[in-house]
Amino acid sequence: MRIPVKSNDVKLPFQTIPLGLIFKEDVCVTISFYETEIISDFVQYTNRKNIHIRDNFDLVLRLLLSSSVWYLKYLKQINQKIKLAEDNLEKSIKNEELQALLQIEKCLVFFITSLKGNDVLFHRIKNLKAQREHFDQDLLEDVDIELSQAQDTANIYSNILTGMMDAYASVISNNMNNIMKQMTSISIILMIPTLIASLYGMNVPNGLEESKYGIWILLLVSVILSIFGVYLFKRRRWF
């Protein structure tokens, strides 16, 4: 089975690790790559509630139940991180907030994949014909409920996060289009006085070369055409 752990890696705050179980008569040895609080919590809870472990399958089922509870616990923390990133994105869209969402999405992918594997393990144990009569039916129901709830919660959060990232991607794309429109509009408006000055500066008769008001007329025409350009672009909502 795979169990959830909180990681010290900032880029991957939550991940899942395999938990191996070796049974030898009445002894069970757990093997894990990382130290996890799930096992110690499981032992303390079992002793505190005076829970009697019937057999090896009963132990595996209770570990599946405990891991599902921890999945739900970490999913609540992931949901808080999603809300925090959403609040930060509402204030300003920066790469840090988007990267935080990508990291959370990666954690959810690990959770969903691991929960599917645990669900397969649960149903294989549940469908063992030789052990059906010995299973605690209440325990089977509890494991089924908690495991299904953890899977549904992880899928819901993943769908919400995917929709949120798609929405922010659309917002960023729309903002880029608006900026490009504004830059294009400004460039066109700035070209108007430049074009008029270039035409006036040509060495050809234009009727204003002898007038002492020629430069002022050109300035006035440039201002009027520029204002008209601004008005036209505003009507088209390019500003």
Could you describe each region identified by the protein language model?
Residues 1-134, 139-142, 146-153, 208, ...:
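Peripheral, non-transmembrane regulatory/ligand-interaction domains of membrane transport proteins
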Residues 148-239:
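Hydrophobic alpha-helical transmembrane segments and their immediately adjacent juxtamembrane loops
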